[in-house]
Each structure stands twice: as structure tokens, then as C-alpha cells.
Amino acid sequence: MSSSVRRKGKPGKGGGKGSSRGGRGGRSHASKSHGSGGGGGGGGGGGGGNRKASSRIWDDGDDFCIFSESRRPSRPSNSNISKGESRPKWKPKAKVPLQTLHMTSENQEKVKALLRDLQEQDADAGSERGLSGEEEDDEPDCCNDERYWPAGQEPSLVPDLDPLEYAGLASVEPYVPEFTVSPFAVQKLSRYGFNTERCQAVLRMCDGDVGASLEHLLTQCFSETFGERMKISEAVNQISLDECMEQRQEEAFALKSICGEKFIERIQNRVWTIGLELEYLTSRFRKSKPKESTKNVQENSLEICKFYLKGNCKFGSKCRFKHEVPPNQIVGRIERSVDDSHLNAIEDASFLYELEIRFSKDHKYPYQAPLVAFYSTNENLPLACRLHISEFLYDKALTFAETSEPVVYSLITLLEEESEIVKLLTNTHHKYSDPPVNFLPVPSRTRINNPACHKTVIPNNSFVSNQIPEVEKASESEESDEDDGPAPVIVENESYVNLKKKISKRYDWQAKSVHAENGKICKQFRMKQASRQFQSILQERQSLPAWEERETILNLLRKHQVVVISGMTGCGKTTQIPQFILDDSLNGPPEKVANIICTQPRRISAISVAERVAKERAERVGLTVGYQIRLESVKSSATRLLYCTTGVLLRRLEGDTALQGVSHIIVDEVHERTEESDFLLLVLKDIVSQRPGLQVILMSATLNAELFSDYFNSCPVITIPGRTFPVDQFFLEDAIAVTRYVLQDGSPYMRSMKQISKEKLKARRNRTAFEEVEEDLRLSLHLQDQDSVKDAVPDQQLDFKQLLARYKGVSKSVIKTMSIMDFEKVNLELIEALLEWIVDGKHSYPPGAILVFLPGLAEIKMLYEQLQSNSLFNNRRSNRCVIHPLHSSLSSEEQQAVFVKPPAGVTKIIISTNIAETSITIDDVVYVIDSGKMKEKRYDASKGMESLEDTFVSQANALQRKGRAGRVASGVCFHLFTSHHYNHQLLKQQLPEIQRVPLEQLCLRIKILEMFSAHNLQSVFSRLIEPPHTDSLRASKIRLRDLGALTPDERLTPLGYHLASLPVDVRIGKLMLFGSIFRCLDPALTIAASLAFKSPFVSPWDKKEEANQKKLEFAFANSDYLALLQAYKGWQLSTKEGVRASYNYCRQNFLSGRVLQEMASLKRQFTELLSDIGFAREGLRAREIEKRAQGGDGVLDATGEEANSNAENPKLISAMLCAALYPNVVQVKSPEGKFQKTSTGAVRMQPKSAELKFVTKNDGYVHIHPSSVNYQVRHFDSPYLLYHEKIKTSRVFIRDCSMVSVYPLVLFGGGQVNVQLQRGEFVVSLDDGWIRFVAASHQVAELVKELRCELDQLLQDKIKNPSIDLCTCPRGSRIISTIVKLVTTQ
């Protein structure tokens, strides 16, 4: 049980009402009452009295423990909602069943025993042996005053024990607890300006002595700045100590007279502090004024705090007991007066700033400068500024010591001079306020005594010296008296350091071996140049427009480090420019051979371009030309031109920030403005300043090349014209005219009635849409030429007369169709009519392939089905057409089919998303039909919701699509939007992806790169070419803090380091880590692989019902994720029986074999990553796992039984999902119960599935996606569901979800668990009261809360130090097994 949590009394019967002012608390009827209960907080009702806990900690009649600052549920009231604000969608009257938190007697006893044992370990390690059981209950783990005594006094000696009397104990090895660093001591030291990691390491070295630790840090810090000036001269050594002591006492007396109570001699002749009121500092760094809390405590009735008497009460002024010293306090065998100076400085005078003067033993002040420290509790004052002030003051102290003058009052005067101190505030960086490069791991608060719990680790501590300044251990407990807990301790754990070393080794550049390889490559290239095959391909390359600019490009690269190349589609920039650079270098000396990396936005383009270039070089891919994508790498030691995805290069930068051995970075398709490419530009902009030899080439479309040139300090731009035949461009009005398309009444592509104004609706009365248009047509005969419409008004809002005025020269029949057409919809009927006109119509354009651009897979399926019912396209009578869908979800083999030229007389029709816009080039395309729409990810930062929305393309997209035609002959492009819409409504450029996606993963990537780790996120994002909105960044930082990956001061936690090293969404990464900790690694990796890639369930167009029924057969525990797990297990079993069996299993169960294989590959890669960071067996490699696998993915066997002992526990797996996905929780609202009369009485009826309502806290009502196994469920045992993502289409949908029960939410839900007494029931709440349960008893509530506290601490320890083996560690193993049993049996 965490000893940092104080036990509080059981609430009395408070009489407060739920108004804005709490009522007066009732009296407690306990026998040991220490006062009446406090009044209830605003709106919270009356508070109860407190009584001290008895030694029987968890008896039913005993106190329950709540957090020190319980938060009331935030329930919106009408008075708090202004007129302009929307009313919150969550309402407290929601019909959500309030579940009860039960615990069996057996489990209660098990948890009690565990907590007692854990508490005894803490008490034994941190308290005196003579304390009673009652005192042990409240003993803090940081208490160990036996190590300290007042200066000048010695502890009483205990007589030697008779050796015969204790002979039986000789063989018993005494218990030596692992030393635990007090978090309050760390917080105390950090307020002097030192980094918490440094504080921890020094405290451990000094056995927790805060005074010794502070003096050591100050000495080390000052010695680096002042060096020789700190040495004591021989003359000073001759001065008598008595003389120095006399002068020091005189100065202390004078300071007491001048400063009054502000001056405190904490330890006689050793430590002085002077309280300061530096208003200029406070106002300069004021952010928010903390609210003052009021107290209503009867002081006289309180007992004296025993920790205060010992000198180390960490609660200070917040302590609920009296801080008074009896006349003669007896402690142990020593009669002494208690040194309460550690409290007086805070309680007697609340100063934000203190000047601290320290004298070591035998110090010769004023002939020797004292140690000077500037201390502040103002959290807004940067740590570095505090150290700069201390150094400034110590410099003055050294100067005064040279003339043997007292310095303290002069230092006070200096601090009060604003002009002097303000100069020091500009520098917010200091070596000792930043973490060191290497440091010792922080020891766990969880005491682990078994040697097997830790692997042997040799720490490397670069900043703690071997010699400790000789400091007398006085009775000085300098821990913080604040009750708000320590700041998070950040540890770059050793496993992550090892991971970075391993990554760096992958990219070690050995110049000697590389140059030797280069010599062979040059020789082979010269030989190859003479071959016929090479010369034949060279002639084709020389016909490309890019070849004409070859010398210009090479000359510019010799003069400039960064060059922007702007080229039209088809100019050859992607394939030729890297070869220009490589060929030029191969004709030179071996040490000058280029090593080029060319990034591509998509995997398909990286593969296809690499294969094309290798073919042009008359070699197979993987030699001098290779590619690398996630999970697939085709390259060798001879590869000098590598095509890779942008993510692969960013991952390399984590371990190789200098890009060793790389001569050129080419960023292709930079105009697409993906999140990764924009971030890569920022990284490269930093690297080029550090590596003058690295050259960067940005390749872009023609529209925005200047934007990138300006970003790189106006670097030169080369424009390459495209090699395309003329392309005739037509718009919607032209397409309607050539096809003579007529919109039928009742068509789904007609405008809705809502789009017609109310005035026209009244005038229309009962006329149909066509009758209305006929009337407009008649009136248009009188339309005057001067009638016009503003260009800003979109066509969708215009009626017939207005359209006729806008489109002069267009036939009235076309205008008639346009006036009733819904331009927001993709008109598949018109596309079919255009295809018929192209394939079978009479026109002068040459035959060729047709490329149709549609927004997404759904539209592709609909058009494909529609064309299958048309005899011209279905090939039932004649083989006229061949239709190929093209989508990123298709396999590489399926995608390659679009490049195959059809037989003569057969028209190839490709129905594609925007993947065909820039990523691939299909040479034989003559016709392009552009629907004008695309799927674009949008992100609402305020709701934390992603949506995939149909949006209009930009002008740049439209030009790119047009450019796909005319590669081999004159082409035609039909845009299914009007010419006016193109000229006046379309954006010039698409919104950059970084401005419309969540930023969590990018934040982690920024922080894991050494070049940005010390910068705040806002400053890094502001340097992007077009930064995202600050609201989006703020929301991402909040989510990362809630997840435990980022601290409030924007530093990575240990969990953050691990999540940053995993190339997945942060929630998926957390699922993998928790699966490892709770020994259900294999199923956790399976679910993680599916979430990172896609679901293996498929739904054929003509067998949707059958496919859904098959998926329901896998349904288990109301969870899509567990259904997926069941399906994957079945596939693994089938693979062991052979390829045929695996194929049949997938076909019968509507599963994608390709997706399952990709998931298996991902699982192996994730296993390797977990092995690298210490969360799986050491040395696991994905390739080795695949080789050893005998059917299936091989992960279960590779990771071992220990890591998967709970792999068959579905309840625990659901709990892991809760740990990873929280706070993505949906409430299930049930309608009021309906009853049906039967012969035995009224029976409650199950509600229909449609009657259930699903609500999220921030977004209100959502819907379960029809593909979910929970879509038709009528009853859920628990009213809470977890989900990974929300999507917004026509409505807000939860795609996949999983029911979660009470215990996983309480134990693994993020944030604070609150326990409150409401109407006689103990209510356990999460998330500000949005999730609530009723505890069966207050004992159950307390047990669960205390167990949660222990679990949180254990998880922190494991994540900080992955070398802890929770399987063999007694403490960790017991906590884990208890949690597993609770989750499984309750």
C-alpha cells in the first residue's frame, strides 16, 4: 500500500446540501475523535469527522481511504451555460445502469493479505523498530531518522548481544531493504534548480541526506564555473576556527535584528535561510493564481504529529495534527529538543524565495566563501534561472571572501535589485537543470529483494563524482512539506539507451569497406555501359524531358546544397534525376561515389519506381538500386540508390541523426504535403546546417515549388516541362452535352427538397421539379443580358435562371439538367454514360485505356457492380472491356494488373482512388474521368475525432489527374464539376495533412530525436513549413499526458520513450507493453497488428449477409477484438495443415489471407521491437522467428510460456484493451424497463437493439457500425464499451468495440479513482464522475483503491526498468497474480 497516501477518517453524517455552499459537517462518533467533521465543499454536501485508524486496517467498521484531493463530478448546470455556448450532450439523468463493485470473501482476504505484506515491507524499511502497530499504519516510507542526530550529540550505544543467545540467527541472512529515494527529497532539491535525475542519483549516493546531496551538487556545479577560485589559500588554513565561529555568530545576530523572522538559523552555525519577497520575479513569471483553501479545524482538540516531533513531517502546514513541541520530548534513549526549523521557514512565513547559506564542518567563513543557494517554490520560475542566480551570488561571495568581509546582507541587497537579476533570466538553459547524458536508473519504490528480479546492469554515471564532500549528518530533514506529491521522475531507462545504440550500429559507416565496394561498382558500371541492353534503354531515357536538363541539374548541385526541381507529370524526374547523380559519381573516383536515398509517399510507388529504375540500368532490383518499406527490404551492400517510404527514413534518423555515409536525400512528391514529408523537411533543414556535404533535392509539381524554395532560404528552382500530348479538358456541362445525359425524376442524384428556398416552395405548391424547371425555362425567354450572379455563389445554390445567366452559350437542356442535379454527389449514372460514349461513341479521339478517379473503395464497388449489369462492360456477349479496381488495400500483385496492356480491340478501364494521381504512372491511359472528389482525413481537435470525409479536389489535384491522360497520344479529361467551380471554388492546394490529423505520434517522434529533445513542442512545430493549429497541438499534448507518455513540462516519460520507439499509434503501443507485463503477449500482439494494419474480415459485394453471419460465429464476450483473435487462432491452426487448408479456411470464413499474413509479419516485427526495449526475450529477430515457425507466425513459441501464461484468459485481454484504449469509452443507455405478463408474474423484456443509445463523454450520441459484432446486441452485461477509433461519415460511428466490466475500468482506467459517500453508499468514480460504480461496502472500495495504487506503482517501476522480471519477483508477481484473479473471477 502506498504510504504516501494519508488515511482519513470516515465521513460523519454531514448536513451539507448540494448548493454552492457546503453545510456544516456532523460530529464523528468514534471513540478517538479529533474534532468535528469539516463543512462540505461547494455543492458537495457536508463533510464527515475524522478519527484515527486502528491497527485493524481493513475491518468493516474501520475507516476507508480516499485520495487527498477528491474531485467532484463535473455536472453541467444551466447557470453555467451562456447563450452562445452549446449545451453539453452528457446529462446526469442518463439511463445507464449503475453497477455494483463486488468482491468475494476469498478475494477480499487475498487482497488484505497482499496489502498487509506490502505495507509491512514499507513500514519495516522506512520506520523505527519501536513503533507500535497503530503508528506503523501512518508511517511514511521516507522516514528513517535513526541516520540523523543533532550536531554535537551521539546516539546511545546498545550493549553487545550474547553470541550464544543468538547463535540460532547466525545462519539467517538479515533483511537489507533496497534504499528508496524519497520523492519529496527529490522535489526539495529540484527547487534549487537541479534536474530531478541528478537529484535522485546524488540522494542515492548520499543515503538520502538532503543536506549532503545539496552541498555536493552545489560544489560540483560551482567548481565547473569558478574552478581555481574555490581553492582555500594556505593563509586561510592558519586562521583559528574559533575566530571564524565568533564572527559568524555576530553576523547571525545582526541579520536577525535586520531581517527579523525572515532570518532563520536552521542548524546552528551550519545553515542559514533568509525569506525574500521578490515581487518583480513573481509578477514576471505569474501564470495563474492558486486558489486559497480554507480550514475549519479546532486546533486544541488535535493530537501532536509524531512525525513533526521526529523532524520529518512531509505534510507540513497541511498536516491534520498539531505541530507543537512539548517541553521535554523523549525520543528513544536520547532526551533532546526537536529541531523544527524545517517547518518554521514555511509555516511562520510563506516565502516564495529563499536565500540559503551553508557552512561545512570546519568552515572558515568569512575568510572562505560559503555555499550559496537560491531556493524557490514558484513553479513558474525556470530551474536554470535559479542556478544562474546562485552562481551570480556565489561569484560575489568569492569576491567578498578575498577581503574577509561578511557577505550575506550584500547578497540580500543584490537579490532585491531587479536590474541585476533580470539580466540572468534571459538564459533558460543550464547544464545542471537539464538531464545528464547518462545516469543511474531510479530505484523502484516497490521493494524487490529477490536477486532474480533484476538483471545484472553496470550503471554508467557520468556526473556523480566518486568523492562526496565531508558533511556532518546533522538532524536535517529537508523534505518538502507539500502534500501534492512529487513531480514525475523522468528516466531514460537503460534498455532504451541500448536500443539507440543498436539502431546506431545498423548505420555505422565504415569508409574503408565502402570505398572498396565502390571500386567494384564503378568497374561493373563501366563494363555495363558498353552492353547493347544498356545502350538501348539509354536511348529511351534520353528522349525524356528531364534528360535535357541533366547538365543544368548537375551544375546546380555542385554549387548549391539544396535544390528544388519542379516537373510536370511524365517528365521523368522520379526515375532519371537520381540516376543522373549516381552515373555522374560512378564516372569519378570510388571515394566520391554517391549514396542516394529517395523517399516516396507510398509503398507501391517505392517498389514500382525501384523496379523500373533497376530495369533501366539492366540489372535486377537489390543491387545498385533497391527499395525499403515497412516489413520489406530489397537492398544489399552494393545499393547506392535506395527508394524508401518517408517513414523509413524518419525511423533511421532516430538512430542516425547525421545520416552517416549518405550523400544525397531526394524527397519526391513533396507537394503532396503529407505529415511525414513536412516533418522530414524540418529535420533536413536542421541537418544541412550541420552537414555541409549532404545535398537535398526536393521534387515537386509545378504549382507550389516556390513555397519550398522560400523555406530553404530561396534555394534555386529548376522547372522541367512535361512530355505529354495535348489533353482536351472538359467540365460537367460538357459531359452532359456530349452524352445527352438527362436526369430522371426521382433520381438519387437530384437536389433534395431542402435545397429549394421556402419562397419557391410556397410558389411551387404541388408542382414537380420538372414542372418547376419548365416554368423557369419559359420565364428565361425574357431574361435580360445584364442579369448576372456573383462569382462567389456556388452553382449548387443557383436556380435555372441564375445558371442560365452564368453559363452563357450552354444549351438550355443542359442547364435544365444542371439546375436539378446535386453537385455534392458523385454521379455514377453520368460516369457510366461517359464510359459508353468513350467505348462505343463516335468521336475522333484514339483508342486507349480509361482511368476513372473515385473517392473511395465504396464508390469503386458501386460503379463496378453497376457496370456488371451493362452488357457493354460485363463481357457476357463479347470481350469489349476489362475492368480493374485500384486501391491501396489491394496486394502488390493485384495492383500490378493495371499495368498490363490488354489485347487489341479491348478497352482497359481502371477504377481508382487518388493512388493513381501521382504515385504510379499507367502509360496507355488516354481518357480520364475525374469525379472531382477524394477521401480526406479530417481531425476535430476539440472532440478528438477523426473523420474520413468526401471533399472536392484542389486545382493542383485536378491538374495532376488531367496529366495522367495523353502519355501516348492526344488525351481527354472530363472533370465532373463545372468550369465555374474549377475557377472560383476549388482551393489552389490541398490543405497540408499535418493541419488535419492528430499529432500524438509526431510529438513523440520529435521528442525522441536528439536534435529536438530539449525544445518545447510549440517551438518545433512553429518551424514547420506550414504549422498546425495550436488547438490541435494542445489537444495532442493533453492526450499524451493522460496516457502517461509526456510530462507537463513536455518531456518523455519512460512509457513515452517506449511508445516513441514503436512505429504504431500510441494506444496500440501501450497495448503491446501491457500485454508483455501481464503475460498475455501473443494475443495482445495479434490485436495490435490488426489495429495497426486492418481487419482481416472481408465482406464480398454479393455476400454481405453471409459474411456478417460468419463473423458473428467468432463473436465472444461482446468484443470485436476477441472475435478477431478467435479468427486469427483458427487461421494459425489451418496453416499448420498446409497452404490448401489455410486457403479453404479463409474462403469459408470470409477472411483475407493477405491481411492475415501481413498481421503475422507485423507481429514478428513488434516482437523484435519489444525484445530490443526489454519487454520480450532478448535477441529475438523477426526473420529468425519466421524461419523457425512451423505454421502460423511463430511468436508464441519465440516469446515463451512465461510471457503467455495468461494468453487464454479473455477477461484479462479485455482488461489490457481497457488499459490501452481508455478514455475511449462509450456508455450504453438502456430504455426504461418494459414488462410482460406471464403465468408466473411480470417478466422484464429485453429492449430492442435499436432502442439502445450509445454516448461518449465529449461527442454525445454515436452509433455502432453495422460491421461490428455488437451491432444487433440487445443487452450488455456491462454498460461500457471500449473503442479504438470514431469515424464520421453520414453519422458518427464506432467501428470496432469491446464490452468492458467493472474491475478493468477501476484498475486500468486512467486518471484518479475517487471514492465518495453518497446517500449511504460508497460510490467509486472515474473521469470526473462520468463513470460510476457502487461499492458493495466501504471495505471493498478501500481495498480496490489501495490495490490500484500498488498496481500503478508497479507498472511505473516496470516501465522505468524493463529488466525487472515480474515472473520471479515476489512482490511484483503477487500483485500481478492478484489483479489477474480479480479481473478473471469478479
Swiss-Prot record:
Annotated segments matching region Disordered: 1-106, 120-147
Domain Helicase ATP-binding residue range list: 554-721
Gene3D superfamilies the record matches: 1.20.120.1080, P-loop containing nucleotide triphosphate hydrolases (3.40.50.300), Zinc finger, CCCH-type (4.10.1000.10)
Motif DEVH box: chain residues: 668-671
Keyword Zinc-finger in record: yes
Enzyme class: hydrolase
Domain UBA: 180-220
Residue ranges the record marks as coiled coil: 101-125
InterPro entries, alphabetized: DEAD-box_helicase_OB_fold, DEAD/DEAH_box_helicase_dom, DHX57_UBA, DNA/RNA_helicase_DEAH_CS, HA2_WH, Helicase-assoc_dom, Helicase_ATP-bd, Helicase_C-like
Superkingdom of the organism of origin: Eukaryota
One Gene Ontology molecular-function label: helicase activity
UniProt keyword terms in alphabetical order: ATP-binding, Coiled coil, Helicase, Hydrolase, Metal-binding, Nucleotide-binding, Phosphoprotein, Zinc, Zinc-finger
Catalytic activity: ATP + H2O = ADP + phosphate + H(+)
Binding-site residues, ATP: 567-574
Zn finger (C3H1-type) start-end: 299-326
Positions of post-translational Phosphoserine modification: 127, 132, 475, 477, 480
Ranges annotated as biased composition (Gly residues): 12-23, 35-50
Entries under SMART domains matching the protein: DEXDc, HA2, HELICc, ZnF_C3H1
Biased composition range(s): Acidic residues: 133-143
Composition-biased stretches (Basic residues): 1-11
PROSITE patterns associated with the record: DEAH_ATP_HELICASE, HELICASE_ATP_BIND_1, HELICASE_CTER, UBA, ZF_C3H1
Functional note: Probable ATP-binding RNA helicase.
Entry's family note: Belongs to the DEAD box helicase family. DEAH subfamily.
Protein name from the UniProt record: Putative ATP-dependent RNA helicase DHX57
Annotated organism of origin: Homo sapiens
Gene name per UniProt: DHX57
